[in-house]
Amino acid sequence: MLGRQVTMLLKVIVAVAVLFVWHRSRDSSRGDGSNGDGLSDSSGNGFRLEHIWAYDPEDVVSSCVDVSEEMRVSADEYVSMESGSEFVESWWAKTGARPFSHVFDLRSRSMDIQRLQDRDPVSMEKYIDFSLENPELARTIELEWETAKIQVPDVRNRNTVLALALMSSNAYVRTPYTGDWRNLSSSWGHTGEEKFGWDKDGLRGHIFVNKITKVVVIAIKGTSSQGLFGSGEEDTITNDKINDNLLFSCCCARISYLWTTVCDCYMKSYTCDENCVEAELKRKDRYYAATLKLYKQVTEMYPDSAIWLTGHSLGGALAALLGRTYGVPAVTFEAPGELLPAKRLHLPLPPGLPDYEEAIWHFGHNADPIFMGTCNGASSSCSIGGYAMETACHSGQYCMYDVVNDKGWRVNLLNHRIHRVIDEVILEYGRPAKCQRAPTCIDCYNWKFVNKRRNRREESSSSIASSSQLTSSHSESETLTSTDAPEKTCIGRNWLGICTDYGV
């Protein structure tokens, strides 16, 4: 009898221990145990890749393909055959995973944000165009803002941060599938040759949808570069490099006279035409303009869904810029400092709201020179590769893993790769990095930026004022002259009628 009681007691102890371990493991997987709202359930209704969007900057054409079940199978088989290659390992953290079929689990939380009342994409593009042409007048416009409670990614939850990082890595994935691409550019008046299929050179976005919760996540592809940034794949290198050098350099990637600049805004030593750079950023064949199209087309496909943004490297910076433009949440990974291009684009910010209170979170670690803004100088890896990564300042909040002290890492460009961030940072830390206000910094402090448009107006006003003063002085002189020498009248004439005597 006593032996049976001991056996039962041992079974109870084992059961309690199992439950304790299970609860601890569940809390650990949730990061800090935050009780955010789940955006996935046991039936697998989470986020799946539903569309791939591509943009051709040469013809200013965007196209989209729906990810069908047939495409999932063929694309996952292609990835499986490439398992173990440098290509796969550079963008996907789990070799052999199925990125086209994977169901992502994200958690959300409520957050009060200030955003524009009119967030219609057409209205926003008109405002940005106007602010670039007339920045002084744009500052006088009183935009209408609203405070709204929205659902944002719970960045305190490790699984949520991990899922967004995997989505960002997913955006690097190429597929051999070339059928059923739809042209989405007809509304922009495109009349040239339509290109369908996989376009290697341009911006790409992977669109993940949760049809139950009506949330859409747009993951924007980062920089592709052979042996430099993160993907190991050579697609989109040319345009990625142009946009990197335009967005994150002080002046068109003018490092020295040996460099070929990406725009003609350089004036002289450490002097740059500010209006020229701003206009270059908004050109229709640049990536920021492409992200505006991407957002517009996704909102047309899912008008009743909330939009979240994510991306790695260049893709993260573009996600942050797009998030500020429309007031939607953005979570980035190892993004270069994007505060300078945000200011150059004159993106709206609620009056009195510090930029660190926006719904933008930048995750990164201090062994990545691009995220830290230290990959510059003639001998840096970025400069040797032809990249002018001169910005360090971020908008929103700053979430940094201290791998230098915690893991003994040294600053190295290889640490920028997305798969290393996922495998050796996010997965190895028990909790996500704490998000806080970004350090105070100033980009390009030693440069002089000339506002030629403002100078021309001031010169014109000065010229008009000088002309008015000269005219006024001339009139006063004439008045004084006529007053000092009043007109004389004739007081005597000869027999012919000619005046011979004058008097006052």
Curated annotation (Swiss-Prot):
It is found in: Endosome, Multivesicular body membrane; Prevacuolar compartment membrane. Keywords: Autophagy, Endosome, Glycoprotein, Hydrolase, Lipid degradation, Lipid metabolism, Membrane, Signal-anchor, Transmembrane, Transmembrane helix. It is an enzyme of class 3 (hydrolase). The keyword Protease does not apply. It catalyses: a triacylglycerol + H2O = a diacylglycerol + a fatty acid + H(+). Residues 461-483 have a biased composition (Low complexity). Pfam families: Lipase_3. The keyword S-adenosyl-L-methionine does not apply. It comes from the Eukaryota. Residues 1 are cytoplasmic. Residues 458-484 are annotated as: Disordered. InterPro entries: AB_hydrolase_fold (IPR029058), ATG15_Lipase (IPR050805), Fungal_lipase-type (IPR002921). Its EC number is 3.1.1.3. Glycans are attached at N183. Residues 23-504 are lumenal. It is a single-pass type II membrane protein. The chain crosses the membrane at residues 2-22. One of its GO terms (cellular component) is endoplasmic reticulum. The active site is at S313. GO terms for molecular function: phospholipase activity; triacylglycerol lipase activity. Lipase which is essential for lysis of subvacuolar cytoplasm to vacuole targeted bodies and intravacuolar autophagic bodies. Involved in the lysis of intravacuolar multivesicular body (MVB) vesicles. The intravacuolar membrane disintegration by ATG15 is critical to life span extension. Belongs to the AB hydrolase superfamily. Lipase family. Binds to both phosphatidylinositol (PI) and phosphatidylinositol 3,5-bisphosphate (PIP2). This is Putative lipase ATG15. It comes from Candida glabrata (strain ATCC 2001 / BCRC 20586 / JCM 3761 / NBRC 0622 / NRRL Y-65 / CBS 138) (Yeast). The lineage of its organism: Eukaryota, Fungi, Dikarya, Ascomycota, Saccharomycotina.
